[in-house]
Amino acid sequence: MTDAALALQAENLRMTFGETKALDDVSLSVKPGEMVALIGPSGSGKSTLLRVAAALQVADAESGPVSVLGKTMQQRGKLSGRVQRNRIQLGFIFQQFNLVGRLSLFQNVLVGALGRLPTWRGVLGIFPDDVKQSAMDALTRVGVESFAARRASNLSGGQQQRGAIARALVQGAQVLFADEPIASLDPVSARKVMETLRELNKDDGLTVVVTLHQVDYAKRFCDRIVALNKGRVVYDGPADGLSRDKLIEIYGPEFETAFEGGDA
C-alpha cells in the first residue's frame, strides 16, 4: 500500500437481482481517516454496496474494480484470487453482532487474531500472551472490559456490538464497514455504539463506512454522507449540507411525517 492508496475505491458498480437494479453504476471513493454514512430508503442499495465493497457479494460482470487500501477485492464480476489476504485490514460489523453465543466475550474478540496466526492455534484455542493482551486492550478501548468473561449470549445488544468492534481492532483493521450496526438497539445502546465508532475514527484514525437508517445519527456522527435511492448515488457531500428539502427528495414526501420531531 502506498501513502496515496484510498481506503475504498469502487468504480461503476452494478448489481442486479432478477429485474431489480440494486446498484446502478455506483462509484465511491473514501479517503483514509474518513467517517462516512450511507443512507437511503430500504432497498436503496446501501447494504449491497457495503457487501460488494467487502467482496461478500459478487457484483455483475459489467462492474468496474473495487479496492480497499489499494488492494483489489473484485472486478468484472470475479473475486480477486487474494481476496482473503486482502481482507485482513478490513473489519466488518453486522447488524446481528455475529458473535458466538456460547463463547465468552473475550474468546469472541480473540477470534479477530486468527487471520494472522498459524491454523493450529485457532484449532486448539491456544493464543499467545500478546494476543490475549491486545484482546483485553480492545475490550477496554470500547468500554466493555468488565464483561470479558461473560458469555456473549448473556450480553445486551449494545455490549455485543461493541465486542464486535473490539474483535475488528484485534484483527488489525484499518478500515471498518458497519452494516446497520444500531438498527436493533435501544437509543442509549445505539448512541454508545456510534460514540465508540466516532472515537476510534477521531483518536485512532480508523476509517469507518456505516450504513444507517437514522438520519439524525448520520448527521451527528459522520462528516460525510452518501445517499442512495434505487441503486444510484443521489447525494455525496458534507453532513451539514444535507437539507430537509434534499432529504424529502431522497426519501419521498413521507419523510416529514416519518421524521417529525427529529434532528434532520
Swiss-Prot record:
Annotated residues for binding of ATP: G40, P41, S42, G43, S44, G45, K46, S47
Entry's localization field: Cell inner membrane
Subunit structure: The complex is composed of two ATP-binding proteins (PhnC), two transmembrane proteins (PhnE) and a solute-binding protein (PhnD).
CDD domains: ABC_PhnC_transporter (cd03256)
Native organism: Maricaulis maris (strain MCS10) (Caulobacter maris)
SMART domains tied to this protein: AAA (SM00382)
Keywords: ATP-binding, Cell inner membrane, Cell membrane, Membrane, Nucleotide-binding, Phosphonate transport, Translocase, Transport
A Gene Ontology term for the protein's cellular component: plasma membrane
Coiled coil regions, renumbered to chain: none
Gene (UniProt): phnC
The protein, known as: Phosphonates import ATP-binding protein PhnC
Catalytic activity: phosphonate(out) + ATP + H2O = phosphonate(in) + ADP + phosphate + H(+)
Pfam families with a match to the protein in the record: ABC_tran
